[in-house]
Amino acid sequence: MSEVLSHSCVALSELSPGEAGTLHHSNLNGILRLRLMDLGFTHGALVEVVRKGPGGRLLAVRVRGTVMAIRHKDAVRLLVSRLR
């Protein structure tokens, strides 16, 4: 099982491909926040960055066994604790 490196949170966008973190907080509001929650982006969910797209504008992430793309500007607002 993975171990948390520290209690400090970083933006999901700061993780490199292959790195994962536990979702702690979302600074998103409105319909986007609800949509991401419906897709599994909830407190305590394991989120892994699978790949970063050209120019870094999109991230492919795995959450609850599903890979999906999210925009960098939204990933900046999702705070995670890095996992080892």
Q: What positions do the PLM features span?
A:
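Long, charged amphipathic helices and adjacent flexible linkers at domain junctions
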Residues: 1-11
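Short, conserved, surface-exposed binding loops centered on an aromatic residue
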Residues: 13-15
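Glycine- and charge-enriched low-complexity intrinsically disordered segments
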Residues: 2, 76-84
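Amphipathic, hydrophobic secondary-structure cores in small proteins
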Residues: 17-74, 79
